[in-house]
Amino acid sequence: MEQQHRNQKSMQDQNDEIEDVQHGPFPVEQLQASGIAALDVKKLKDAGLCTVESVVYAPRKELLQIKGISEAKVDKIIEAASKLVPLGFTSASQLHAQRLEIIQITSGSKELDKILEGGIETGSITEIYGEFRCGKTQLCHTLCVTCQLPLDQGGGEGKAMYIDAEGTFRPQRLLQIADRYGLNGPDVLENVAYARAYNTDHQSRLLLEAASMMVETRFALMIVDSATALYRTDFSGRGELSARQMHLAKFLRSLQKLADEFGVAVVITNQVVAQVDGSAVFAGPQIKPIGGNIMAHASTTRLALRKGRAEERICKVVSSPCLAEAEARFQISVEGVTDVKD
């Protein structure tokens, strides 16, 4: 009887393992079972391709640039990866079923969650832009805590990753917000992987490190605050505009790949610039997010924040494939983002 129980438990463990393999991203080591040499797999990992999905998503010319991998090997790798992760057509009903499994991470405000239909969506990029002191970084701090909550409380049951380009990340804010949700402060801090980015190349390299970390453990959220700050200083003038936009496009594409591979919610903050033209004489200068069309096309959902009275802030859904254009009021307090207390 005991032996039968052990066999059943062993079969259950095997089924759980199979289920994990089927639903999670495939580690790139699985290519070895398809005849790819361990040395070549190591070269893929060193190039930042830590999952089979990342190999499939990469253009062929990118794989050819990896030192020590020949053209014949690249073709063999692509063939093996494509069998594990087929990228063909699927029916809209299958896609709809997959979309129903997407998790929304609560923002901390019920009013804000209402216009977001549950919260920040996983598996896509959400851009938050606005002037200074409008709550972008405070919303990011709140999300770092709420993403660790259980699913039934609006969380993502995962860790958070924070790339800080402006030096505005404050761990003590996470402790204050954790108290609001009854979470253990030290555990919350331990579940946030933090990195300070010092230039645009460093910011891009951090994404390679992020991918290898996401293979090892479950992350629910990836924040880049701000995605564009370093581009404003590293590239100057119209002469470097083309190079800046190309570099930014590659960075945003890498972020989208992380969202696709690991199902994380990617949140990027963006700075704004005053748009001074003829109408500004009468209506005052209008603001617009920097990054141009490349930034607009890369973001799945765009949220504009602006200041209200005192600590009140207003969030507007500017563009989204599934959310209606709407506004919500929220408040910045010691507990992070909360509903406005009238």
From Swiss-Prot:
CDD domains: Rad51. Gene3D superfamilies: 5' to 3' exonuclease, C-terminal subdomain, P-loop containing nucleotide triphosphate hydrolases. It holds the Pfam family Rad51. The keyword ATP-binding applies. Its main location: nucleus. GO terms for biological process: chromosome organization involved in meiotic cell cycle; DNA recombinase assembly; DNA strand invasion; mitotic recombination; mitotic recombination-dependent replication fork processing; reciprocal meiotic recombination. SUPFAM superfamilies: P-loop containing nucleoside triphosphate hydrolases (SSF52540), Rad51 N-terminal domain-like (SSF47794). ATP binds at G130, E131, F132, R133, C134, G135, K136, T137. Coiled coil: none annotated. GO terms for molecular function: ATP binding; ATP hydrolysis activity; ATP-dependent activity, acting on DNA; ATP-dependent DNA damage sensor activity; DNA strand exchange activity; double-stranded DNA binding; single-stranded DNA binding. It is found in: Nucleus. Residues 51-80 form the HhH domain. It comes from the Eukaryota. GO terms for cellular component: condensed nuclear chromosome. Keywords: ATP-binding, DNA-binding, Nucleotide-binding, Nucleus. Binds to single and double-stranded DNA and exhibits DNA-dependent ATPase activity. Underwinds duplex DNA. Belongs to the RecA family. RAD51 subfamily. This is DNA repair protein RAD51 homolog.
